[in-house]
Amino acid sequence: MQRKKKGLSILLAGTVALGALAVLPVGEIQAKAAISQQTKGSSLANTVTAATAKQAATDTTAATTNQAIATQLAAKGIDYNKLNKVQQQDIYVDVIVQMSAAPASENGTLRTDYSSTAEIQQETNKVIAAQASVKAAVEQVTQQTAGESYGYVVNGFSTKVRVVDIPKLKQIAGVKTVTLAKVYYPTDAKANSMANVQAVWSNYKYKGEGTVVSVIDSGIDPTHKDMRLSDDKDVKLTKSDVEKFTDTAKHGRYFNSKVPYGFNYADNNDTITDDTVDEQHGMHVAGIIGANGTGDDPAKSVVGVAPEAQLLAMKVFTNSDTSATTGSSTLVSAIEDSAKIGADVLNMSLGSDSGNQTLEDPELAAVQNANESGTAAVISAGNSGTSGSATEGVNKDYYGLQDNEMVGTPGTSRGATTVASAENTDVITQAVTITDGTGLQLGPGTIQLSSNDFTGSFDQKKFYVVKDASGNLSKGALADYTADAKGKIAIVKRGELSFDDKQKYAQAAGAAGLIIVNNDGTATPVTSMALTTTFPTFGLSSVTGQKLVDWVTAHPDDSLGVKIALTLVPNQKYTEDKMSDFTSYGPVSNLSFKPDITAPGGNIWSTQNNNGYTNMSGTSMASPFIAGSQALLKQALNNKNNPFYAYYKQLKGTALTDFLKTVEMNTAQPINDINYNNVIVSPRRQGAGLVDVKAAIDALEKNPSTVVAENGYPAVELKDFTSTDKTFKLTFTNSTTHELTYQMDSNTDTNAVYTSATDPNSGVLYDKKIDGAAIKAGSNITVPAGKTAQIEFTLSLPKSFDQQQFVEGFLNFKGSDGSRLNLPYMGFFGDWNDGKIVDSLNGITYSPAGGNFGTVPLLTNKNTGTQYYGGMVTDADGNQTVDDQAIAFSSDKNALYNDISMKYYLLRNISNVQVDILDGQGNKVTTLSSSTNLTKTYYNAHSQQYIYYNAPAWDGTYYDQRDGNIKTADDGSYTYRISGVPEGGDKRQVFDVPFKLDSKAPTVRHVALSAKTENGKTQYYLTAEAKDDLSGLDATKSVKTAINEVTNLDATFTDAGTTADGYTKIETPLSDEQAQALGNGDNSAELYLTDNASNATDQDASVQKPGSTSFDLIVNGGGIPDKISSTTTGYEANTQGGGTYTFSGTYPAAVDGTYTNAQGKKHDLNTTYDAATNSFTASMPVTNADYAAQVDLYADKAHTQLLKHFDTKVRLTAPTFTDLKFNNGSDQTSEATIKVTGTVSADTKTVNVGDTVAALDAQHHFSVDVPVNYGDNTIKVTATDEDGNTTTEQKTITSSYDPDMLKNSVTFDQGVTFGANEFNATSAKFYDPKTGIATITGKVKHPTTTLQVDGKQIPIKDDLTFSFTLDLGTLGQKPFGVVVGDTTQNKTFQEALTFILDAVAPTLSLESSTDAPVYTNDPNFQITGTATDNAQYLSLSINGSSVASQYVDININSGKPGHMAIDQPVKLLEGKNVLTVAVTDSEDNTTTKNITVYYEPKKTLAAPTVTPSTTEPAKTVTLTANSAATGETVQYSADGGKTYQDVPAAGVTVTANGTFKFKSTDLYGNESPAVDYVVTNIKADDPAQLQAAKQELTNLIASAKTLSASGKYDDATTTALAAATQKAQTALDQTNASVDSLTGANRDLQTAINQLAAKLPADKKTSLLNQLQSVKAALGTDLGNQTDPSTGKTFTAALDDLVAQAQAGTQTDDQHQATLAKVLDAVLAKLAEGIKAATPAEVGNAKDAATGKTWYADIADTLTSGQASADASDKLAHLQALQSLKTKVAAAVEAAKTVGKGDGTTGTSDKGGGQGTPAPAPGDIGKDKGDEGSQPSSGGNIPTNPATTTSTSTDDTTDRNGQLTSGKGALPKTGETTERPAFGFLGVIVVILMGVLGLKRKQREE
């Protein structure tokens, strides 16, 4: 699919790891939820017996307790399941201890109907007082003071207790239950105080009332107790407002006054609460914006920045576990709805790293639209530090990059306020305070305690300083301890020993505890230690630790007080860097200013689900701080008492949102860098500085004047520049009623000019002053009241200042009224284009040790998909580098490397990117891809990987333009090229990587052996000469060798010189095993060598051992092994309880031999010999047993010449199992594990049960617990003996054990999964593109599983399958919420099925013909046209090359169509060119068209020959012209060459003398020179004759016009007359008209007048209408409603058209009769066809007795005769005859059924069968043929003309088909008889027909 946007899509800006400052839970217990649960529990207990309740409690206690603990700890940010068992037991939890005694409300002391408040309180106090003894006992166990007490609803109190001690509490007398409580955290007011928020609350009473903030995030828990308003009466969004919106939007709902609206845009449902267990990001964000907790106890509430603001829960992250990301469509919908519903501010703490500012990005466009509607957007900057910080994601640069930005999309949005993160000043954590009771106090300081059990282990203990032999603080070696350490707290120094060794030695020395002092010399605490939990230990910073050592040294016998508790302590990170080290750097990649401002985001406390709280860090926490502050600003703007209210009310759209941002940035406080001499922190990191909410509100209330850059932005964007003097303008706006003057601060720190620098020791980025740089105003800054002033400033840099550096800083202005304005500025001195877009091979980012190979070529094996680094070589020191001359792949399918691609480390964002393959001459072979933009490479902390650009692969094929086929490219040198423009630049950069396409393997010759003496040992070498003419021999020098079948697969070769003909001499040492296998004779050698393209040569040779002249017997593999087992090479088992052992070798003559079998008997070996190679093969059968065998090899068949003797042992007895049991013999289990037990034979070495190696006891018995999963489990047990023989047994065990009934409980078919399913019209079998319906099928795991999709319950079938349909339409992203549950459990989980589809292919319209070839003589062909699609993304490829693509990150739900204008050049080849044009949409639907172009180079054709018809004087002359060659066309011009047209076949008729030009042209556009032919022999007409002809034609034209206007003639002839009149007028108007042309026009016009036909007269109209009515009646309904296939109309409709035409009278009678005849012909054909189709062959082929012909022949004759008739009335009579014949044939069919005959002779008159009367001959129609015994078929009765026929009685009636049904003329019904004469019916027919014929005849006579 194309739509793979933004790398990892949009991720939560997230919370960064807290590391050492991870916060532990704190705060008191809340009991309300637990009380209600206890009450419900009591009610439940009353419904069951005590025994049942006890058993139920026993069964569920463990599970529910663990779950409750996990839930409680999860809200605190602790994953209970990740704690070890000791930690799980030692951790403290909050509980409510409930007493056995009843509470006041239940003990009978109070009457609930009238007890007073005082009485209730009095009795409650008594209950609480009675708790004293139990509390004392509880405190003995917990060592904690009891917390809050309860006595009215519940009798109990709260306390803290370790998990392990909970059962102890339950055993205390008087305790009824111990219930785990929910825990709440204290909020941290420090963040609000940092930004002066409290001052706004107190001074201005602004808390966000009347404002709405949209939280576009992971969701909000609207039931949280802090999600409240103090007064919900005066709110911006009422329930009614929301319901109006939801009625229109068709989604979302009202929740409460604090959260008036919410919707889950990701899952398409109303579940707005984030169900993530570990942390709820959106809930934390919501709390920072607007939590409104109550009370003074910070442990029980959180107060956000705008506590009275309403919050919108716009959930854009799914609750599905399948995805942690969201996409453009979801996000855009939430942004748009935020604006529509009226949000004042929207917050997005999310993003995708290193974004851009293009409005093609749908999210950025949506933010812009929201701004334009007046909704301010606040977005986090991101948590990725710099792109140069490698894997750290902090403010460091290890690569020396000029472009380090990482601000993410949509935070790059121009109109958004983008927020960086600063550290909070304080944090709550576990801390230690050490005192001596008099003056010493160390701490509180952050520590890491080895276990919470040891909080009291250090208090009031003596301390012991451990010293080494030098008298310095020891690092904890055991030898440094003395007996004096016993019972004391030992103090040691960090270093050398592991932490657990330090603990172990201190404990061994008898110390009571251990303190480890850091060794870095700073105040940084030691908190990341791997400590055991069994010995009391913590660490101290160097500073604090040294103070403790000094004090203890001076007071060795004194005890110290040590308090360890959760404490608010200074944030150590804040002391190191006020900014959060993770906050992403700006600017945007086009040098636009970002981030905009900083807010507290490091270590922030806020809300979590279920009334919980936690600490998080990230720009995600800083962004909502600004969102809340802008809500306060908006409230100030809405305050009618504000003196500037009228001004603020004028602000609309972007003017409003820009103003809010400007005010905050103008009043922000720049942060200084405490680590680098208090210089400024770069504006690229902090924006305008730390937000000061009070200063911003002060400005709105007192002086809202602003300063912005010339472009209106509240920061100066200098972009890139090269002059040392840079001028820019600022716009000052004075919104007051008095004149203001401003002075620029001259502070040498804040207002100095800075550039970026890198600390060489740490890589940390910081700013440094530019000496000699300054900014000065061009004039005094005076701004009139209510006006603006634009002032020019000049930035001056010293001439010595190097280019390619940032220049930045802050401008601070003090107003004459005391107000202040702050404005950051930033630019790049140098050329922004110059920074490289791609790191080179082995470049600055190349770090193999760190897993980062930077830019590197990838070679892929298509069969396996395995990728290899191309050209990678390793030097002698083990360093890896890429040799760009060794990069190659092969087009040979047998090679290892089948294609090449590039993995690019992009140093910058790039636009207009193209990836090409070039040949050795630099010609483009193909374009692999084209992209509008690419994002730079960075390390993604979420996925723990670098995000590279993986460019497409090239497999060595190309598109052959000559025939349109894909072909393999020639071997040779090529280039893999990427090119693009750095964002913000305008110059294209190119980066090339050379490689070779090589399909030929290297050649190897002269394989031999050599030997050298090295260190007194003979070293053998295999030598050869090798050559590769293209890619070169393998640069890694890898080679595989075999000597006598002893292999060395990891050998390497060295170069030993070069031969005269270019071969490389190579040698590779033999391994010791190979050397031992050498013999004196023909040694078989094999050399396997590859080139760099992986083409392999496998060369075999027979080699002699150096110095050897004899040819002894050589057995391959070093001889017959000492042992033959199932793993021995050469052994092959058979099915008869044994096998065959085969070996081979060489000898100059045939070899024979013997072997001994298991019984010791000698047998002959089976041997073969190849004299050509001197090689032999021998085999011997072996038995599955253990025995000794001998093998003797002889040089003769008589076995007298022994060559070699071998002794070996056959070891083929496999190990055996006895008493092997799986699951104690049962095939079923309900447990999580089963036992596999058994005993194995004594020779067994190992037993593997599945993946587990079983332990064998002395009796060779084993027992293994094997875990099993739900369903079928195949358990394999394999025993292996010392010889490698194995025996395997297996069994399938079916388990019903399922610890999580809902895990994997639903699976879908056909590739459908939870999460995103992306497909097009052809890629998904479950989808029907014609209907847009998806049919989803699948299966559930349990019969008790329930499945709900999109709010509808899905039926589950007995076989556990299901099927349901979803209407997906043809385009869009369609999410459907899924809820999976189980009827046996009271829990469900939420998932989502999301379908992203486009089922409509794009349309492609090309201006060049795709049906017929195009011919041209221009080699530069332009393909032009347009492509459109139903979505906005299109990519274009031509001839297989990707030549254009649009911005890929689209909003597929936008409804906006896609459009691409195509204008692409193609270089043509001479001859035929097949150009393939393809357009592809976002879901890979492709439309392809071909243009065939023939190209021949331009040439000049020979001129044509022109011949006149006469050269004598004549009125006309015809000029003919012939081209000089075939295939050419001659054209002529009569206007001097201005226009040309083809010469007609008959020639050019010339009527006036003149010059005519002729030229030849061909299909390619070639032309000949034009030749002139001058006509001079045209004789002119006599002027008098010409004038007479003109006058005659003029008169005739006038007459014709009069006739046309009379209205007396039919339309056809009138139209023809009009055309003739126009033609005559044209002839008359010709300036060179001749007498002949005028006479001809006169003649044609007179003909048209003569052909005028009068319209239908009234009397004929009446007759015609009657005739048509008669025909309609004759047809009846059945026949009339049949369709004429030639017109597609029914016959009745055709007759109705005729009736309408007759009534209009626009045609003549003859025209009507002709049309009617056509209709009747069609009727006859249709009727005949119907009769024949209804007649079985046995009847149709039977003879009609009356005619002697078959019935089929009768039908055909009647049809032919009728259609041959020219008269409509005759045709009607034949129609009647066919209808009569239909009745007769039907009777014959019935008779055939009854009698079994089909000859038409079985009917009787009384049964209606008739006598089979033949069809009348054409001349007999209408004559009386006697009684036919049957009625005509439906529609057969023709109503008579009342004027001519009176044969029917007035009593007659007819049915709806015109059939007489009663009266004298009625026919008998089926089965009736009649006594009427047969001629009565025929008489009627005859009279009717005669009347019609007479009428027609009369009309003709008239």
From Swiss-Prot:
Biased composition (Gly residues): 1797-1812
Signal peptide: 1-33
Reactions the enzyme catalyzes: Endopeptidase activity with very broad specificity, although some subsite preference have been noted, e.g. large hydrophobic residues in the P1 and P4 positions, and Pro in the P2 position. Best known for its action on caseins, although it has been shown to hydrolyze hemoglobin and oxidized insulin B-chain
Residue positions of the active site: D217, H281, S620
EC number: 3.4.21.96
Species of origin: Lactococcus lactis subsp. cremoris
Keyword flag Transferase: no
Motif (LPXTG sorting signal): 1867-1871
Sample GO molecular function, one term: serine-type endopeptidase activity
Stated name of the protein: PI-type proteinase
Region: Disordered, residue numbers: 1796-1874
